[in-house]
């Protein structure tokens, strides 16, 4: 009788047991070094599942293979792609048909517990963190903003009798009404939020201006102190002097925090300590190299007899070697315990601790005198140090005011105010300030918060305690904010060229003048008049803006057919020039750039302004400086292009806050305070009957409406003022040309026009538009079926397999698109075309 099916299968499985066990044993050592990540289980399961399906699919036509695949010898087999084995029409097979992502490869990542299977591949910008973690019920996604109709959609709602000019006029009116309605809805939705009121409410705007002006004066005083005490004389904004630049920025921060000259001494102490640490590391490195050299010299002197046991010990297992090492280390530790620890010398360092332990074990002889006198020498040193410490207690120690600790909170809802976060964090020791960023409309107006504490606190303990607190049913999710790593960053060294430096002086002087005038920084009051003083840093600045040339000498020499003696003969390309460095101009420019950075928080070479820097953890954080000289010569075109680019990028900093014109404001619905006050009075004048009128604000009754009106203006004047302030509040928001609003949701435009031309020009697919993330649960648009390329190709940029042929060369006939996303048309005509043959108009 034959064996059962189970016994037969077991025999087949055990056929290569020895081979498999040897293979697994070799892999065990590699797996020991790696952490056991539970996140990889999904990937292994997917790999096994795909292999199983592959085996089951072709089990009829092929014999099973039972030996394991060796990943360390050869890569795993790839699955063959067939025309009939395609899931292009099935939206839940998201291996290669990702229409909205820039990658056509399979989705590597654990499947998300929510939403469409393809959505976890997309970039989840704009999706709240709770939604990405699976807690979608905790998130209020809100109703999507209504989209404005296109002209074509608007025409469908009109009657056929409306002509073209009337339709255009009505569409313009529709656009104005739509924007007005959107603006009013946005105002009503956000008018009670702190960030919105601080921007536009008349009372809050005045307070905000006073605070910003006070902080500007504080920063100005810090800069003037540095300039008067020659802190800026020896520092240049070059990447080689990054340490000196950081020292100047830290000194400015110490002065902003109210520090004194004693507190500034801590910068010198830190500099000396850094030098000492560098010297320790260098000395440890030198001793290590000397030790290696001596060992190499002593190695050939060893007899051959000593080498024989070494060769015999080689095949010892690593486990036994580890046990021997542990046994050796235990008696060494016991011998070190009774002796006291040696004091560190100037040559010792933490980095060289391994080398120190090696030297102690290798040469025990020098330790014997230290063991005898190790107890006496520390006592003598302590006795000598004790009387010196007493006078130090009386002196004031410098404070590290430039260093802080901070907590970062990523998602603060707009309804939580700064005062609430301040009250929450004030209970912890060392609290200093709170900074809130501007709300982000694309992220549901969430804000980022930075809570700054003193350097002496345990910031991790505070962060942990804040993590367990909910504010208005919102988790703050704080994290410890790291210190800035690279505070000084460099840009192109072409900025050292003299014409560029002169142009930068001109732009920086203009920018300083514009920012000072906007902030009224140098305006003082003499009696009733406002007198503007000149910024001392701009004094005699025009002397450096004028270019001096030898025009007369060049003219006389050119008429005689000679060249000036000072001009060197040009070598190489005449259009290229060497970078000329002018130290005098650079010194003037650096003072202007330090003024912009310290006073106005403007990083000139980065062409940006750091907002609310006075409330941030580091009040002078980052600065961009000039890089090293370019190794090659530069062309005139590069110089002019650099000047043009930096002028364009600085243009927004020069621009004054734009407001709408009166006509545009009236079209958008600007309100009149007096008319709104009259409407308020009319709404609060109610007729009860004949000669009976009621004021609902107080509940009093009057004989006529004029008495109610008089009563409201006399007894409820504060209500009238509130109405007028509300009108001014709305008008301030309306007239701001850069007012915040909901991001417009634009529908995806089908490819046409230029896309068709691109296809005709030889491209396989039309250029891809900006990527857009679909709302939760919304199905993706249908992909084209038979005939032609799909509407959204799997990889329009050729970054994966399938698009290689179209990028092999320009001007060639495009290869066959290996598009396995959609099934090809079975009725398509198969043809052969000779590439060397002349063009034929009638080919298929």
From Swiss-Prot:
The primary location reported for this protein is: nucleus
Gene Ontology cellular component list: cytoplasm; nuclear body; nucleoplasm
Q: What GO biological process terms are annotated to this protein in UniProt?
A: primary miRNA processing
> Basic and acidic residues compositional bias: what residue ranges?
16-73, 277-337, 376-397
Keywords in alphabetical order: Cytoplasm, Nucleus, RNA-mediated gene silencing
Report the SUPFAM superfamilies cross-referenced here: RNA-binding domain, RBD
Record carries keyword Cell inner membrane = no
Q: Where in the cell is it found?
A: Nucleus, Nucleoplasm; Cytoplasm
- Asked whether the keyword Hydrolase is assigned, the reply is no
Q: Composition bias, kind Acidic residues: at what positions?
A: 349-359
* Region listing for Disordered, in residue ranges: 1-90, 277-401, 555-575, 794-825
- GO MF annotation list: nucleic acid binding
**Which InterPro entries does the protein's record reference?**
Nucleotide-bd_a/b_plait_sf, RBD_domain_sf, SE/Ars2, SERRATE/Ars2_C, SERRATE/Ars2_N
Describe its assembly: Interacts ncbp1/cbp80.
Say which family it is in: Belongs to the ARS2 family.
Q: What functional role does this protein have?
A: Acts as a mediator between the cap-binding complex (CBC) and the primary microRNAs (miRNAs) processing machinery during cell proliferation. Contributes to the stability and delivery of capped primary miRNA transcripts to the primary miRNA processing complex, thereby playing a role in RNA-mediated gene silencing (RNAi) by miRNAs.
The protein's name in its UniProt record = Serrate RNA effector molecule homolog B
Species assigned in the record? Xenopus laevis
Q: Which gene encodes it?
A: srrt-b
